[in-house]
Amino acid sequence: MHRFLVFVFAVGMTASVQAQSLAEAYRDYWYTGVSVNQWQVEADLSGQNKHDVTGFISGDQTKDWDIIARNFNFVVAENCMKCEVVHPQEGVYDFTLADQFVNKAKAAGMRVLGHALIWHSQCAPWFHFDKDGKPVSREVLKKRMREHIYTIVSHFKGRVDAWDVVNEGFEDDGTPRKSLFWQILGTDYIPLAFQYAHEADPNAELYYNDFSMNKPTKVEGVCRFFRPLIEQGLPVTAIGMQGHMILEDNVDNSVIKQYDHSINTIAALGVPTFFSELDLSVLPNPYGFSGANINDRFSYSPEKDPFKNGLTKEKEAEINQFWVDFYKMLISHKDNIIRVNFWCLNDANSWRNDFPIKGRTDYATLFDRQNQPKGMVQEIINLVQPQQTTKKNKRK
């Protein structure tokens, strides 16, 4: 498909103040991040809303960047660093949007993740084909991959701290995804991508990232693939789990228990993990749907959009309890987690409103449609706040 300080928000002439942000509260544990779309930066710079590279826009983004800078210490671009944007044609690179995003983030003192170097989706159409429309040879694709990765990583060297090197390379059953990269290069494309990225910037952290990593078959398949490569010295800093969750799936805390297992499975490789794209859909799940494959789409029906006019108190309480329980699980694994990253700043611009059913009203993020932190944010902070004076500072 793969970031919080004092909560002081301006909405009109009013302000809502929270004593401490998640990033501050959890600075001894991990980085706390969020995904950012280019229009959030552009709206801040121009004072008006802008469309992102996909044409999507929702809500008022003119204050988003201020909230992001106040409340997160790690950011990732949702779209503007992907292949179809920065490398749309062979030999043609456009870093305009990506540079603007990275420069803005570094000026605010935040760490930056580049997302993503090699991904079958949103890869420019020319990448795998020759001028006659036929698949290129192994050697041509390796050359294109190397040039693509070297050029992008070198351009951002010293500014981008980490990269999602390969994104979504496995199916839910733990077998390699039969993408065009796989069809031409087999699974060799994965270690080659890490090799090229490390050569281009030896100091950058390098990640593998995927969805449905709560499923035992998938996380075990991914780890089975990476184990010998890591043992042979492949520069893999961490294995990431996206964490696109659905509330109704969490019967008896089953989703949380699955992620508990997955963290242990990855830790057994000798590398840490991170959550790269956390959100929680509270809407009914279409039959047969799971994961975050962006090609999965379903038709709209009113019964699949029950909270169009707002959540019930019971549903709000259920959501709050989920996040508290989820964070309790994360805290128990604090030595094996390096980052907890949320996908989209607020409910208004969450992709969940349009995936996998377009036009619904979801409540998937930590901030409401007015950019106010939801009640569970303080509850999550309270899990560790009393400990801050006794723990050694781990994250600056």
Task: Report each predicted region and the residues it spans.
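Substrate-binding cleft and catalytic face of glycoside hydrolase catalytic domains
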Residues: 38-39, 70-88, 97-214, 282-286
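Structural preference for beta-strand elements that scaffold enzyme active sites
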Residues: 29-33, 74-76, 111-113, 160-164, ...
